[in-house]
């Protein structure tokens, strides 16, 4: 169990980023206008934006003043939100992913191909990332307030964290120090005393649902959860959590304990 948690924490995605045709220097080769980067599944796209912009700076024809402001990523012409973990977005958007028995075939190892875009007008649904890490940090804190409220019935625990504890919590994500992360997380809730679980379900049409999952029913299965939110488990071909196809018979309580993301939520992607 602990080994699986460690693998989830260190899980990565291979990503190819190509500069959008709208902002690339004319006649730039594909090799020059693209870069490859390994992104952590349990991290935010915004973490990687400055690195990508700097790597591709020589091929960008438009002037810019910030590595964050007016930048965004697109996938197949659609804006990709930065406020969800990278792995969740990849599992949701990757159309080439196929399952073969209990294992994924080689298509799961293909690059996630993103476009780097810039402009004053953001695509619909894209939250402007203006203040860089500080904005991501504030958003992440807000997510934990929501998660704590669901888990404990109030956000008191996250609000009452000492400044050193909160800073250590944040830095543990950036430095990938799982032991520090778990040490602070343990102060925010206890699985044995939780009231409900913070769960988000992405549907095949890209809608995100946030059902109420009371822990009074510790035998609640994925299938029962889907049925409760009018997503017939019979019509769902697969349920993906942290890149892993899970059984609809799996226990939600146990899945949360293993697979909850850095923002306190368990994400289920249905297809």
Curated annotation (Swiss-Prot):
What topology does the record note for this protein and the membrane?
A: Peripheral membrane protein
**In Gene Ontology terms, what is a biological process of this protein?**
protein transport
Q: What is the deletion mutant like?
A: Impairs the formation of preautophagosomal structures.
Alphabetical GO CC annotations of the entry are: Atg12-Atg5-Atg16 complex; autophagosome; mitochondria-associated endoplasmic reticulum membrane contact site; phagophore; phagophore assembly site membrane
Question: Molecular function terms in GO for this entry?
Answer: Atg8-family ligase activity
Enumerate the UniProt keywords alphabetically: Autophagy, Isopeptide bond, Membrane, Protein transport, Transport, Ubl conjugation
PTM comment: Conjugated to ATG12; which is essential for autophagy. Conjugation with ATG12 involves ATG7 as an E1-like activating enzyme and ATG10 as an E2-like conjugating enzyme.
Mutating residue 127 to A has which effect? Answer: Reduces the formation of the ATG12-ATG5 conjugate
Tell me the protein family, please: Belongs to the ATG5 family.
Task: Name the residues that span the membrane.
Answer: none
**Main location (coarse class):** membrane
Please give the name of this protein: Autophagy-related protein 5
A Pfam family this protein belongs to? ATG5_HBR
Q: Which InterPro entries match?
A: Atg5, ATG5_HBR, Atg5_HR, ATG5_UblA, Atg5_UblA_dom_sf, ATG5_UblB
Q: Where in the cell is it found?
A: Preautophagosomal structure membrane
Give the gene that encodes this protein: ATG5
Q: What else is known?
A: Kluyveromyces marxianus proteins are shorter in length and have a more ordered secondary structure than their S.cerevisiae counterparts, which might contribute to the superior thermotolerance and solubility. K.marxianus could be therefore useful as a new model organism for further elucidation of the molecular details of autophagy.
Q: What's this chain's function?
A: Involved in cytoplasm to vacuole transport (Cvt) and autophagic vesicle formation. Autophagy is essential for maintenance of amino acid levels and protein synthesis under nitrogen starvation. Required for selective autophagic degradation of the nucleus (nucleophagy). Also required for mitophagy, which eliminates defective or superfluous mitochondria in order to fulfill cellular energy requirements and prevent excess ROS production.
The annotated crosslink position for Glycyl lysine isopeptide (Lys-Gly) (interchain with G-Cter in ATG12) is: 145
